[in-house]
Amino acid sequence: KEGVRTVILGKPNAGKSSLLNVLLGEDRAIVTDIAGTTRDVLEEHLNLKGISLNIMDTAGIRDTEDVVEKIGVDRAKEYADKADLILYVIDASRPLDENDAEILHLIKGKRAIILLNKSDLDMQVTKEQEELPEEFPVIEISAKNVQGIEELEDTLKEMFFQGELTFND
């Protein structure tokens, strides 16, 4: 299917699957409190404010001894490499760590939007965080409470109509 190839990246339990469900308006991805619930790439097609997206939910990125989870992590990185756009979901209720550093390295030089999720909780990561590269828009969201999603959609629309996002067939 045609659309902006959009990959949701982040550590385990950051809220990637919850974000996908919110954007789709239905519970497509399994959401639990168990880190590593998503093992494989879940791909969905969605029309967001007139923009066609092929959106992919991926396994949380972390060092893991679990063989199956590791394949999912490697696959997430491969998909990120081919993405037109990366939605990097950060659990803002926890401080950034070396896994975040790895993801920030992965998205360098790509089109990305950084989403500080769980803004309904006590935030440990803010927009002013020096580790966050200035080249990317940073939006506070709460996937659980559907906050900040409108701002995300508007940012996507803006990027698209400014020609920053292109389609891949």
Model feature map: region roles:
Residues 69-93, 142:
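Inter-motif core of Ras-like GTPase G domains
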Residues 1-52, 64-66, 96-169:
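C-terminal-of-GTPase-core extension/linker across diverse P-loop GTPases
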Residues 57:
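Conserved active-site aspartate in kinases
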Residues 35, 61, 69-73:
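Short alpha-helix of the ABC ATPase nucleotide-binding domain corresponding to the H-loop/switch region
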